């Protein structure tokens, strides 16, 4: 574990520049730089994931009394004809997903996004990111991403993680983390105030996509959920549905 060093690059700040100051359009200069920053086309894959309507962000919202379909908000008029609501025990799986172009009304999307970035609520707000597997992937099961713990259930992450441990033992485990002498405001791969996961060694396209949404800035999250509407943002206020969300991932 590297200790006492200074963090050279603020990834959160850099990724926040993906969109312009108004949060309406992409910053082409920053996008071009990020293509080069991450290896093996990782940014290309993550960015594509954010644009393919295969990423679903669920927020636990127990005080939301306008939730539809047993806690999952989705406009019936805007669901693709080939898709079903995520109500009950349904999760985004092949043939059963909510491809809402607007998810819910704009005000609700904005409110949920604010909860995830407000300094007073973000640490208390439960959220889950589910990625629907695509045809090219070996497993058709939904992929679970926990960016706070820097964990992903995909094969790419598992191979990366196990490879470090098997090849380097305890040294490999220690090398997974970086500890800095001063507290940093870079939230990218952040474990606590002074420690980050070494994202150059432990990362996958799903984690990078999730970090772009949740560890950068509010304008970036709103760009993909409200402006481009390529990431679906839902609220859940029913405990049974919240538990089913996790049980389906285990299955």
From Swiss-Prot:
Region (Disordered): 83-105
Record's keyword annotation contains Nucleus: yes
Keywords of the record: DNA damage, DNA recombination, DNA repair, Nucleus
GO cellular component annotations of the record: nucleus
Domain of life the protein comes from: Eukaryota
Subcellular location: Nucleus
GO biological process: DNA recombination; DNA repair
Function of the protein: Plays a role in a RAD51/RAD54-dependent homologous recombination repair (HRR) pathway to repair MMS-induced lesions during S-phase. Required for error-free repair of spontaneous and induced DNA lesions to protect the genome from mutation.
Sequence similarity: Belongs to the SHU2 family.
This protein's name: Suppressor of hydroxyurea sensitivity protein 2
Species this protein is from: Kluyveromyces lactis (strain ATCC 8585 / CBS 2359 / DSM 70799 / NBRC 1267 / NRRL Y-1140 / WM37) (Yeast)
């Amino acid at each position: 574990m590297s200790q006492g060093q200074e963090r050279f690059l603020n990834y959160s700040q850099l990724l926040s520049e993906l969109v312009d100051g108004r949060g309406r359009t992409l910053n082409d200069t920053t996008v071009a730089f990020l293509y080069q920053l991450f290896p093996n086309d990782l940014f290309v894959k993550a960015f594509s994931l954010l644009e393919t309507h295969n990423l679903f962000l669920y927020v636990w919202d127990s005080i939301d009394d306008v939730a539809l379909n047993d806690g999952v908000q989705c406009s019936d008029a805007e669901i693709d004809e080939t898709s079903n609501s995520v109500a009950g025990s349904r999760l985004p799986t092949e043939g059963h997903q909510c491809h809402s172009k607007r998810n819910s009304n704009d005000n609700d999307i904005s409110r949920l996004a604010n909860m995830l970035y407000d300094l007073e609520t973000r640490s208390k707000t439960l959220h889950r990111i589910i990625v629907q597997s695509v045809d090219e992937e070996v497993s058709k099961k939904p992929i679970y991403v926990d960016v706070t713990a820097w964990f992903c259930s995909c094969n790419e992450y598992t191979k990366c993680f196990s490879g470090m441990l098997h090849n380097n033992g305890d040294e490999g485990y220690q090398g997974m983390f970086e500890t800095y002498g001063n507290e940093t405001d870079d939230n990218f791969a952040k474990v606590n105030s002074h420690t980050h996961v070494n994202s150059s060694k432990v990362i996958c396209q799903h984690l990078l996509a999730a970090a772009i949404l949740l560890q950068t800035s509010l304008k970036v999250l709103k760009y993909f959920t409200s402006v481009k509407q390529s990431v679906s943002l839902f609220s859940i206020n029913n405990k049974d549905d919240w538990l089913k969300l996790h049980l389906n991932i285990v299955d």
